[in-house]
Amino acid sequence: MGAAESINTVNIVTKAYAKIMTTMVTDQDITADQSQVFSIDHVKGDVVIKGDVFTQMLVINLASLMKAIATQSAQDQLIDNIAQQAQAAVSGLNLAQYAYVSNNIDRLITACVQMSTDMRVSCKSKVTMTQSFSVTDVEGDVRVTGVKFNQFANILSSCAMDASVNNDQARDIVSQIKQRGDAKASGLDPTTLIVIIVLVMVGAPMGAGFMAGRRAIGPLLASVGLIGGGAVALGYVPRPVKIEGFSSDPDFTLAQPAATVKGLTFTAAVAKLKSTDGYGALFWKNYDVKGTTAVKLQETLSYFAPAGYDPASWAGVGDSAPPFRIFPGLYQGKGDPGARPRAAYGYAGPVAGPKKGDAYLDGDTGSYYVLGDSWKMRGTISGHQNGRTDYWGTVDPTTTAALTGSERYIWVDPFTLVKSTVWLFTGSPKKWTQQQTAPLDIPLTNTPSDFNVWVYKDDTAVQAVKWSSVGAGVAGAALTASALLMPDSVASSEMSPAVGTGTPAIGTGSPAVGTGFPAHRG
């Protein structure tokens, strides 16, 4: 129920966010002043003005209207809504998830605050166009022929891009909270609790009547053991999924995965773990981590441990809070970066385009840029030659045919930025030859919310029911065997002589006591 509740509250967060974005007051002020003035005075002769063209094109990207939050009250309302729904989202998960969800809620609020701050700036543009002719006191003909005045004004504020970048961050965090809600860690399932309670309620009366009804109690205990064991064997005792958070890669030399699946989302991987009895744990890998740097994989990897997995070899030894930072996405093209530049080699660019922190290489100049509030140049690849296009990527140029049409390629090592190298495709026959190192000034981005996760099935309830069933079964078998091998009638007959022998002894003492009475009287 916690999973469903957390999903619902996350949906409410999204709706509240969409509502405040829809109802916010926009402050877009675009002014275009146009004027064309002809002033001709005191001219003795003909005045001919021919072919005058006055053209103006004003293009306004309406997405910039979503840039502005004009009032502080709108910002406050946004943050209040997010904070309220964040509390509801956290309450929908148990304490095992509290730290993770709290961190993501904090990231969500931070992203929203950043977005509202960026969008607070009004998108104001002003275009003034003037064309003026002033002819004064000219004696003779005045001919103005083929005059053209063309101006193209493209009003596209970078704030729209800022808003979309932050919106992607908020949407990713909401998605992660929802996924974690789907795979919510929980304690004992109510069904398991019922089974344990029944065992206790049945076992207590049986213990009290141990000597009184072996024939009835023994089979009943044995039946309880069989039922509990059957429930465990048939999978009726739930095995809730628990999330341990970030973990280093499992040691596959000690434990081979039962299956490895590519491209699964976290939700789909957890669902597969739940539905497959032969799987005991899951390592969901979304980043390749080396040292303090992580690079996002083009496809996720889901490693499923067998049911009898060894936690010591599968859980890894990574810290609960990842210390690494993420290498940004790489893009490339010719000229200044546009809204949707092409992804670099070895990097699958998202449909939404570059995110804040991603880098772009201008192949015509060798200059590279990093996206912050806007694209800013960070440096130029050394050795660039005019007329030769530069390309870059994270793949070895000698292992792919995709670069055969290139001549100069910068191989970027995402784990060691200072070791990026330039390769030339030259020679006869042509082959890739390493030239020189190419240090890059590209900052790493923050730790992601969709990092590698370790998930396992909790066998606590299964073990409790299993051993309770074993105990009940053994006790029931022992009682049943004793009832069959030593019935009540045999036991009574064996015990009766000892009781009878004691009776005369008690009676023998009576005369002695009685003899004393007459003597006392005499």
From Swiss-Prot:
Disulfide links within the chain: none
Key words of the record: Host membrane, Lipoprotein, Membrane, Myristate, Transmembrane, Transmembrane helix
Coiled coil: none
Residues covered by region (Disordered): 503-522
Compartmental location: Host membrane
Top-rank taxon, per record: Viruses
Pfam families linked: L1R_F9L (PF02442)
Main location: host cell
Membrane topology value: Multi-pass membrane protein
CC terms in the record's Gene Ontology section: host cell membrane; membrane
Matches recorded under InterPro entries: Virion_mem_poxvirus_L1 (IPR003472)
Lipidation (N-myristoyl glycine): 2
Function: May play a critical role in virion formation. Essential for virus replication in vitro.
Protein name per the record: Putative myristoylated protein 053R
Highest classification ranks of the organism: Viruses, Varidnaviria, Bamfordvirae, Nucleocytoviricota, Megaviricetes
